[in-house]
Amino acid sequence: NANNNLPQPDQVAQLVEKQNIQYLRIYDSNPKVLMAFSNTTIELMVGVRNADLSAFQSQSYVDSWLRNSILPYYPATNITHITVGVEMVDSLDDATNLVVPAMRNVVSALKTANLQDRIKFSTPLSSAVLSPSYPPSEGVFSSSYENVLRPLLDFLEENQSPFMVDLYPFYAMNNGDSSLDYVLFKSSSSIFVDGNTGLSCNNIFDAQLDVLHFALAHRNFSRMKIIVTETGWPTRGSPYASIDNAQTYNTNLIRHVMDGPGTPAWPHEELVVYIFSLFNENLKQGPETERNFGIFYPDMTSVYNLVFPDKGGRSWCIASSQALDSDLQY
């Protein structure tokens, strides 16, 4: 468990609605959470946990999971995406080979229910699948992941599924790779010009995203949609982790996404971004930063003030490691 102190799902649903958050990502398919978000306008991205990927190699198991864990709540609960595993491809072990077969079984189950066009599916990857690339137009995938990326990209293309990625400019800052203004969207001028394209960039988030855009384009997948399934900033645990920096990063990120116009290399592509995370996670393993990405405390008071706009019908997304105390891997 990553939390043992969270509010009840119906309280979380009320909080999310009150904050004008329109899109929520959870990391499992807990029935209490799915029930809590029924008859709301919130669009839900649900997840298959890494621990369940072995079971998802069986089509009959996946059919049963869809029938028992998803369909009873749909469409009253507006489930729009299913994520299959989380950052599994990064591990470079045998488990990575479970992802695409599991997704194939999910597709097959959705087709049986005639929902393949209504519920999209993919698997979130970390930016580790990209080679360190500068400038962005030199972006390529790391050859270490070739064996798993080739079938994954073909599968996503075949099913018109989005490429999901977790991007954290915070770690560029934490590793000393960048200036704070560049990472917090505070640079008013260009931080570099891509010599190959002549395009200038003024923040690290866009630069990281364009590395991915070019990596996909170099593989002839330039039309593949990208969803940033996690980004955020911790409030404690490192010299750059502070309430002030977290508020600045997420506020400026929201403004950047809402104002458009995409990234320098893909200016017409609408940005779809999920902020991690709704709550701090008091039991999460690892450095202190890992437990302090939340924008709310478990008592539902704000860690800092973040305004979620509703401009022209476009609203905001939040990734919640769990919307209650459920049996999660992280």
What are these regions (language model features)?
Residues 34-144, 228:
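Substrate-binding cleft of extracellular glycoside hydrolase catalytic domains
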Residues 22, 80, 222:
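Short acidic/polar active-site loop segments enriched in Thr and Asp
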Residues 24-27, 85, 166, 276:
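Conserved residues at the C-terminal ends of beta-strands
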Residues 13, 104-108, 117-123, 129-130, ...:
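Substrate-binding and catalytic surfaces of secreted/luminal carbohydrate-active proteins
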Residues 1-23:
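Boundary/entry segment of secreted carbohydrate-active catalytic domains
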Residues 6, 60, 93-100, 199, ...:
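Soluble non-cytosolic domains of exported or imported proteins
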Residues 10-16, 28-38:
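Internal amphipathic alpha-helical repeat/solenoid segments
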Residues 22-33, 43:
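General structural concept
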